[in-house]
Structure formats: structure tokens, C-alpha cells
């Protein structure tokens, strides 16, 4: 192959030097082998006799068993030597016969050029019968199949011969290393090695002879490599030319078959149209009607024959495609296995990718098969109706008795018989069509399956194979000469004779685009004025609307369209100019039009007093900065656009493209410098969403990663990823515009709701006769006051849309990452169907584990909250139930995520369960309290003795439950202090839940009255105070009890119930005040302890009363 010649020349010197070095080593090893063998190796008969003698012995010692094994291995080695010598002889014979085979192939190839004239061939074929032609078609198909098989065999052998130098190099090097080890062992120079047994020495000498035979065979194969390659190439050229001749011959045969079938069909049709009756009978209306039906059937028969011929040709074409695809699949696997990691492999892969059949070239046969079945069913129904000709004719003659006589009756019978024959032939043709359509569908399905598999293999391999040389020092030194050669190879050709008419037609086709662009430019002033009108309405409650921002963005989009339309029109003209790069320029113009549409729209939105400033409220300084950045980034992206188109349409041109490699590298470096400040600003913005930060960070890191790929030679991979990266940038820009538009729409809606509420309050004040102040015209509401549920649902839909579009951009490259499954990191033992197997943990498994961890983290962060907003908040659930559900859901996500991650890394559940059991036992003792609190937390969530919002008392702490976590529960006491209590306390200690099932609680107010008080009056006073209080429940009724005779009081208790816990303190306060007031009004003394002090002098007969001088500070004793 020509694509291998450069590669072979570049390796010639390396192989020559390596073969010379190995030859010197082999001469030394061969001389030593002959000197140390002390003659020839023992014969097989001698060895077999010794082995038989050992086998006859019943009891063998350990030494005898070793000798027995040595003899068996030596016999096997001698067999291999004989086989290799035989293969070497065959190789020599094959090399000797190669020139004669090449001469024969050359002569046969020359003979093929003297082909017969097509006209003479057609004349000869026209004399053959249809059966003879069909026999020749079958024979030609068999010959073509054999030729395709020979071509596949020759291609496979050529691949093996072209990649033989690498295999010979590795084999001879390994053999020389093994010979060196055997020589050292036979010499006894290895320190610490035991002495060789005689049988073991013979075995090693046999192994030495085997290696020498293998090396001799490899050397002979390398010597005959060029001759065999030339012979196979010539044979392949002959088979290729012969296949083309057979295909042409098959086409002529098929044309002859089609012509023969069509002639027979037309003859039948003519017989149907012109029966042997008189013109008078044919003029009969009934006969004429039936003859017209026969004529229609004859036309259907001709059409069916033509369709059958087309299906036959399509079958042949698809069958050839299928054979070539299967051959390519076999060859590509061998080439990948041998040439893995070389630049030659990338060239081969690019060529194979260009020859893949497209699905657009295949016809969908499902509907056609269904139509054929339906048509055949209708034909069979018509045939069944004609089974009894007389009955059918009699039925036709009903109602036409005046027009029918015996001659007309006979004519109708003849017409019906002819129709039956036509239907039989039509049914046969439809059956043949159906059979060929089904075969064609099967072949197409096989072809698409093989093509899909081949495309997947090519996509994976091309993506992970370096397409260019690395940008190292050698690349830099060779850059000037490589650049000079690249400029010399650039040629742009144009066929002016064919180009001018096509350019005129393309100009007419592009004229509507130019007219639309001119119309938009003409109405540009009106569009700007209308946009300013929309901008002036922003902020006004009477004129502002949620549609104002989409309208303004649509106007900016229309303003950006003229340049896009002009680019497309120019690209259309270049496409028709018959340039050798017309297709490339047309594809680039389409990408450039989309590029301008997105970045032009962004430029218009960010202009002074544009949508970003007037609608989104961005500062003008910030929009100016972003406009400058967009200009710089867009200019840096243009070369990447062009070379990404080259990578899609003509990847072979990238192989020696040092200019593109250097330009893309420095463009990516420039983009990295431009994008990184934007990423830094987003991280400094504290209001940025996490997903937005992650997206911008990834988009900023990608240029640096692409630079590394370009520098290491993965130029094609860089361009493929760069194209998707640019499309992702488009998505981010459009998504941000949509995001800001939605947020402004929600803000406008919130302001309108607030305005309506203000108007409603004003109307209520007017109705009540209290006219308030005029409400402000434009009440402002911060974005944080927008309904949070609506905002979160909107964000969920926005991110879902972003995910769908992101998948649509990158889905065609997802399959390339399956290549990571071929990179094994480590192994582990597993079971399948009860059998122990060794499984691999690949790079793909590690990537899946990372993605699963990220997905689990995202679900833990967002799913419980979204579930609360979307579902739980709309259900009538008990207090705290939604919190329990979301918490348990978090635990489930963590468990499933951990099992998925560990399972993908080779830690299956059957291993995890023992680990979990061991950890449970070990940690159960060391972390007993923590595990106890964790289990208690689960009990609390499931059994729900306490819930979020319950008022509880545990020990000396009382308050409201605010949080239930894995280890502890948080209680907010009545002093608004948060108390952290371990979960175990709620399960093991006594707990008072004041609001578990009912918030009704009892209050006890104790009162002591003085001795001598009217007890019945006291009872009435206490009951009156309780029954008249609005918060005291009447069922159960308040009760008063005289509980005890105190030291100085008559003790009473007022027992009553209140509905809510928050009413307890206020009710006690108000009842105490009421009771005090009623006791004063009813002369009931509330008793209290009194103490009298008497002072005696030393004699004991004088009492001194202490009186306080209220004018001074010191008491003045008074003696009385």
C-alpha cells in the first residue's frame, strides 16, 4: 500500500541496525550451542524408550518423576522444532514461487484490460433464454463472492506482512534474551543455582535448538518479506480488477434478465390488450370495461417487473457493501493489534472512516414490505374471485341482458382467462419482490450493524490515537522545513467551465438570503426605536410586561441575522465554484454563521442601553468589559472553528499540518488567558449558583487540557473536543440569557402581585371610611421576596433543559470513553453463575465511580429539598412527617451511592457485608455511644415519639424540637437557647411530649385564705374567675378543691384546662389578677405568714419596742 511506504522508509535504518546487532548475538549463541551440545540431540526414539522404561516402573522416586517430566518436555520441544523446520521449508518454497505467481498475476491483470465490447456482450446475452441468463447471474454472484473472499485473504496477509518487522524485532530480541539465559545456565555461571540433571541439560539444549530454529525462521521471513508483499499486492490488484469486471458483467447480465422479463411481460400485456375478437365485440361496453381492467393489470405487471429488477440491483450493491464492511472489520482489528500507538495506525483509521457507508444511502424497507404484502393479498383475493370463470362472467352480465349474446359471453370468458394469467404472473412478481425486499432488509440490517460496530471501533481508536508528532524539540527544529513543505502542498483548483453556470444558479439561490438581509438592514431604524420603547417601559407597573424582555432579545437576534445570511450566501456560492475545498468552505460558512448569530446576539444584548443594562439591571461598566472580552474570545475562536471543520471532513490533512497544530496551541493559550479572569470573577460573586460555578470552571479548564493534548500529538482529539466545547459555550450563553429573562419575568410578576395587594388595601380603607395616603406608583420588591417555590421549580426546569441540551451536544462522543474499559487498573476475584472468575477494575470503572459520587452528592444536596417543595408541601401531612421522609431519603441516597461506588471499584456486597459486620462489632465497643445515638435517631424518625415543632420536657430541659440529626436532637428552650441533647436520651429516659397527640393541658392554681373565711364564697369566686376567662375550656369544667388546713391558711386548688401550650403562662397571669380583684371585692383575705417580735430587758419585765425614725437612717429605740 502507498500509505505504508513512507513509514517503511523511515524505519529502514532502525531495522537494519537492529538486525545487525541481533545477528552478532545469534552467531555467538549458535557457536556456543554447537560447542556445548557434544554432537546432535538425542533422537525421539531414544527419548521415547527412556520414557517408556520409566512409565513401566510402579514406584518412582522424586528424582525419577523429575526425569520423567524432563523427557516429556524434551519430546514436545523436538516436535516444535520439526514443525518450525517444516514451516521454514514451506516459507522458502513460498518465496521461491513468489516471482512466478507475480508474473501470472501480472499477465492476468493485463488480460483483463482486453475486455469485450459491451454491445457485443449484450447481443450475445440477448440470444439466451431467461433460465440461461438466471443461471449465469447465479454463477457470476458465486464468482464475485469468491473474489471478495480472496481479496479479504490477500488484505489480511498484506497487513500481516507490512507489520511483520515489528513482530520480528520483538521475537528476535526475546529469543536472544532467552538464549543468553540458557547459555548462562548451561555454563553454570549463575550463583546459587543447583547442578543440572542430565535430562534437564538435554531439555535445555533442545530449547536452545528450538530458539535457534525460531530465529532462523524469523530471519528467513524477514528476507522474503519484500518479495511476498510485492506478490500479494499484485494478486490483490488482479482480484480487485477482476471483482470490478465481475460486477460489470453482473450488471450486464442483470440488464439482459430485466430486458427479457420486461419483453415477456409486454408480450403478455399485448395479448391482454388485443384479443382475437372482432372490433365489434371489443366495442361492447362490458367487454371494453373488462379489457381496460386487464390493461391496468398489465401495466402493474410491467411496473412490478421493473421494481423487481431495481431490488435485485440494490441487493447486489448492499451485499457488496456488506462484504467490504466485514473485510474492513477483520483488517482493522489486526491493524489495531499490531500498530497500536503508531502514527501509521491513525492514517489507516482515517482512511477507513472515510469509506464507511452512510445510512442515508439505504432505503427503509419496512413500509415497502408491508405494501407488498398488502398488494399480494389483494391480488390473491382477485384470483380467488376468478376461480370459477362462468360464475364470475354470469355475475358481470347481470343487468346487461340487452348487451350480452353468445359472442360477448365467449369474449368475456377469454378476457377473464387472460386476467387470471396476468394475476398469476403479477402474484409471482410480487412474491419475488417480497423475497428480495426481505433479503435486502436483512442485508441492510447486517450492514448497519457491522458499520455501527466498525464506526464505534474507529471512533474510539481515532480519538485515543495520536494523529501528529508531539511538539518536542525535534518538532520545533523541523518546524520551518515542515511549514515550507506544507505551503508547497497547498493547492486550490477550480473548474471555471463548470463553475460559472453553477455560480449563477447559486447566486439566484442565495438571492433570497441577501434580500432578507437587505430588508432587515432597511428596517433597522424602526427596530431600534421599538426596542427603545420596550426599554422605557421597564420598571413601569402600567406598561411593563413579562414579554418585553423576550421581544427585545428577539429584536437583537433579528439585528444579528443580516451578517449570518450574507455568510451563508457567500458559502453557497463557494460551494458551487467547483473548488477542491468547496465542501470545506461551505461547512465552515455554516459554522461561522452560527458563531456570528450567538456572539452577535450577545454583543447586541451587552451594548450601551441595551437589554443587559435596561432589562437585567447590569452596570454599564460591566457590560463594556464583557463586550471587550467577547470580541477577543471570538477572534481567538475563529481558527479553532476552521480546523475543527477540517477534522470532521478531511482528517488525513491533519497528519502533517504543523501550521494548524502550532496555531491551535497558541490560540488555546490565548483563550485560557482570556477566560480565566471571567472564571475568577464568577467565583468572587457570592450570589453565583453552585452549578453555574462548576460549569464556568470546567469551561475554563478545558482550554488548558486541550493545549496539553495538542502538545502531545493528539491534534485530532483536540479539534473534536474543541468543537464540542465551543457548542457548549453557545449553550451557556443562550442559557444565561434565558435564565436572566426568567428571573426578570418572576420579578415583574411579584411586583404586580404586590401592586394589586396595595390597591386592595386601599379599597378596603375607602370602604371603611378611612382613606389612606396615595400608594407609591412603583413599589419595588427585592428578588429575594419572589415566591421561593416558583423560583426553585423554575430553576429545576432550567437545569433539566441545560442537561438535555448538554447531552445532545456530547452524546456522539460518549462512546469513545468506553475505550477506558480496556485500561485495567487492578483485578479482584468475583463469582458469575456460581463459578469463580477474575474481574477487572478499569479506568472506566473509576470514572463511573467518580460520576456516581458526584450524582449522589448532587442528589443529597437537592433532591430532599425539591421533594419537599414539589410533593410534600402539597400533601396534608402531620407535623414533622416531611422532615422524617427527607432525612430517611438522605440516608437511602448515601447508602445506595456508597454501594454503587464501592461495587464499581471491585468491592462487592458479599465483601462489604463481612466488613460491615466486623466494623459493627469493633466500632460497637469503641463507639458505643455514637452508634447508640445513631440507632436512636432512626427510632425517633420511624417511631416518632418527638417531631419537629413538638414541645417537650426531658430531665431539666424544656423547649421546642427544632432539628433531629443523626447523633443528636436540638431543642430551643423558652429563653431561645439551643440545647443539644443526644438521641439516646429520648429513647432511654423519661420524656414529656406536651404536643404529641393533643395540645390540651391542665393548669393548677393554688390559693390560701385566712382562717374564718367563708369557704363557699371562696369556691364561687374561684369558679367565676375561671368560667369567665375566654381561654379556659368549659369541657372539662373547671373545678375547685379544698385540699388542706395549713399552718395559717385554708388551702384551695383551682384546676382548669387550656387548649394551646402558648396560653398557659398568659392564662395563669390573667387568672391570678382576676382572683386577687374578686377576693378584695368579696372581703376574702388571702392569708400569709405573720411574725411578731418582742424584746425583753435583762430583768425580763421591760419590753422595748423598736420604732424606725422615717426621717433618718438609724432606728431609735423607744422604751415602753
Curated annotation (Swiss-Prot):
SUPFAM superfamilies: Calcium ATPase, transmembrane domain M, Mechanosensitive channel protein MscS (YggB), C-terminal domain, Mechanosensitive channel protein MscS (YggB), transmembrane region, Sm-like ribonucleoproteins. This is Mechanosensitive channel MscK. Disulfide bonds: none annotated. Residues 521-560, 604-634, 679-692, 750-796, 861-886, 943-1120 are cytoplasmic. One of its GO terms (cellular component) is plasma membrane. Residues 43-98, 126-266, 360-422, 1057-1081 form a coiled coil. One of its GO terms (biological process) is response to potassium ion. Mechanosensitive channel that opens in response to membrane tension and specific ionic conditions. Requires high concentrations of external K(+), NH(4)(+), Rb(+) or Cs(+) to gate. May participate in the regulation of osmotic pressure changes within the cell, although it does not appear to have a major role in osmolarity regulation. Forms an ion channel of 1.0 nanosiemens conductance. The channel can remain active for between 30 seconds and over 3 minutes; it does not desensitize upon extended pressure. Its activity is masked in wild-type cells by the MscS channel. Belongs to the MscS (TC 1.A.23) family. The gene is mscK. GO terms for molecular function: mechanosensitive monoatomic ion channel activity. Its main location: membrane. Keywords: Cell inner membrane, Cell membrane, Coiled coil, Ion transport, Membrane, Potassium, Potassium transport, Signal, Transmembrane, Transmembrane helix, Transport. The lineage of its organism: Bacteria, Pseudomonadati, Pseudomonadota, Gammaproteobacteria, Enterobacterales. InterPro entries: ATPase_P-typ_TM_dom_sf, LSM_dom_sf, MS_channel_1st, MS_channel_C, MscS-like_channel, MscS_beta-dom_sf, MscS_channel_2nd, MscS_channel_C_sf. Gene3D superfamilies: 1.10.287.1260, 2.30.30.60, 3.30.70.100. It holds the Pfam family MS_channel_1st.
